[in-house]
Regions:
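Short acidic capping loops at alpha-helix termini that bridge into adjacent secondary structure
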Residues: 49-54, 75-77, 123, 161-162, ...
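Active-site phosphate-binding strand-loop segment of PLP-dependent enzymes
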Residues: 106-177
Length: 213
């Protein structure tokens, strides 16, 4: 846990009122926190995020649950890639949608684009990716993300409806130095980014995450 985080928690406990610390926050999250997240994303990745693009959640799991509900109705499908985090199944099933899984490219665990394009049918309203990936640890390259975006844009135009890209990113910062780890939203405009500080700052018990759109 970062030392600055612990010191700030102690400072807040000593200086803030119990109501401010433990009362209900606004439904979208505390404004100053949303603003800080937006500023950080814009500074690090060069995209024009504003407070209005950020929705605070209880970790990435809640962020994903909200994202799935936002882009599906019963009978729709979400397409993801093997191997994947097993809890995606119940999260999607609760919406009445179906999780379809593209088999892995066993040579390097990047995307098998032939299989992906075949399975990206009209009932798919969102594609779900997780990079760096749990459980494989694979990181999608910039070339992989660009080709993914190209196919999704082509299919969205063909079907006449949006296809959203839901990017599950709790491991975003946990990569080796020099690894090509692109920020997904830079390559596809209809990206819904789901993030958690549980891994990057080792704060799983705090349940702090967000959706960025």
């Amino acid at each position: 846990v970062p030392e600055k985080f612990t010191k700030k928690m102690i400072e807040l406990l000593e200086t803030e009122s119990p109501v401010a610390l433990h009362g209900y926050s606004p439904s979208l999250g505390i404004d100053s926190v949303r603003e800080a997240v937006a500023v950080s994303l814009e500074k690090r990745f060069g995209l024009s995020y504003k407070k209005e693009h950020i929705f605070m959640c209880s970790g990435a799991a809640a962020a994903l649950a909200h994202a799935f509900r936002a882009v599906t109705v019963p009978g729709d499908s979400i397409l993801t890639f093997a191997p994947f985090f097993p809890e995606y199944n119940p999260y999607v099933n609760l919406t009445g949608a179906k999780l379809k899984v593209v088999p892995p490219d066993l040579k390097g665990f990047q995307i098998d684009f032939e299989k992906f394009e075949t399975m990206l049918t009209n009932d798919v309203t969102a594609v779900l990716i997780n990079t760096p990936n749990n459980p494989s640890g694979i990181v999608y390259t910039t070339d992989t993300v660009r080709e993914l975006a190209r196919i999704m844009e082509k299919k969205a135009a063909e079907y006449g409806h949006e296809i959203y890209l839901i990017s599950d990113e709790p491991y975003r910062e946990i990569v080796f130095e020099g690894v090509d780890a692109p920020f997904i939203a830079k390559y596809y405009p209809n990206t819904i980014t789901c993030y958690s500080f549980s891994k990057s700052l080792s704060l799983p018990g705090e349940r702090i995450g967000y959706v960025a759109v």
